[in-house]
């Protein structure tokens, strides 16, 4: 039995063994929320931390690669891996990628049919967009047009489905943001001088005197425009003295700093 027929049988088996959907009739938002497969990777700064985001996306690719190994007995090869440079040099032939792209698309199709990923299709979106860009490079090749078109169609369907799910996720996020206004969980750090605000605690200079909140940008301006040896707190007139090793607090005894 050749590799193609073997992988086809695996795909058919996965589709036939799919369990009935126990979530039928439930609101889509609730189904997505209850079945999200990456909840354990939460961190407080996940929306503002590119490294954390990359780690999560890489974890999804590792799942895809694992299923590719099961279906084809080999890992996904460069440059089709999520962490590879997507740029293809024009001074060499890349036609061999078409067959490999088709195999990866088959893996994604099989995973979409699994109950674990049925309501998590949006986690495949970054990788699908990457594959779609690679498929487009072969769109006008003389041969293999049906294979390329089939890959493009499958990826377009997955991307469209993922984006529909993300519209629901965005709606949930917007509602949750308003709901959390009534809780003490979400803190907003606001500068008393410029009145800019941030969700990051590091946005404000550490409190070392009366609690008057000063952001780091305004703190830098206080140093820039101070007329004495060092700037003072606008409220309690406590002086901020800096040394080469650290920043420490000193009560402004010198009249020039008042």
Curated annotation (Swiss-Prot):
- Kindly list the GO molecular function terms attached to this UniProt entry: zinc ion binding
* ZnF segments: RING-type: 191-237
Pfam families with a match to the protein in the record:
Baculo_IE-1 (PF05290)
Q: Does the keyword Zinc-finger apply?
A: yes
InterPro entries, alphabetized = Baculo_IE-1 (IPR007954), Znf_RING (IPR001841)
**Keywords from the UniProt entry:** Early protein, Metal-binding, Zinc, Zinc-finger
What is the protein named?
A: Immediate-early protein IE-0
- Asked if the Swiss-Prot or TrEMBL record annotates the protein with the keyword Cell membrane, the reply is no
Q: Which gene encodes it?
A: IE-0
- Regions crossing the membrane: none
The species this protein belongs to is Lymantria dispar multicapsid nuclear polyhedrosis virus (LdMNPV)
Taken from the UniProt record, the cysteine pairs bridged by disulfide bonds within this chain are none
Highest taxon of the source? Viruses
């Amino acid at each position: 039995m050749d590799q193609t027929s073997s992988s086809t049988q695996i795909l058919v088996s996965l589709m036939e063994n799919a369990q009935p959907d126990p979530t039928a009739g439930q609101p889509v938002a609730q189904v997505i929320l209850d079945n999200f497969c990456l909840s354990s990777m939460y961190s407080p700064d996940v929306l503002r931390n590119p490294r954390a985001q990359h780690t999560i996306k890489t974890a999804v690719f590792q799942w895809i690669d694992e299923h590719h190994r099961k279906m084809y007995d080999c890992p996904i090869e460069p440059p089709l891996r999520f962490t590879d440079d997507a740029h293809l040099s024009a001074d060499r032939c890349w036609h061999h990628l078409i067959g490999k792209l088709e195999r990866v698309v088959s893996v994604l199709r099989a995973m979409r049919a699994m109950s674990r990923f049925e309501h998590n299709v949006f986690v495949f979106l970054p990788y699908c967009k990457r594959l779609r860009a690679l498929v487009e490079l072969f769109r006008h090749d003389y041969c293999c047009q049906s294979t390329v078109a089939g890959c493009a169609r499958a990826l377009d369907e997955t991307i469209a489905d993922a984006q529909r799910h993300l519209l629901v996720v965005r709606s949930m996020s917007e509602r949750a943001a308003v709901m959390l206004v009534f809780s003490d969980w979400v803190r907003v750090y606001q500068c008393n001088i410029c009145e800019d605000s941030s969700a990051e605690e590091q946005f404000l200079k550490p409190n070392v005197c009366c609690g008057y909140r000063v952001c780091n940008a305004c703190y830098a301006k206080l140093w820039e425009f101070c007329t004495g040896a060092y700037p003072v707190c606008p409220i309690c007139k406590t002086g901020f003295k800096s040394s080469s090793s650290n920043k420490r607090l000193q009560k402004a005894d010198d009249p020039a700093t008042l």
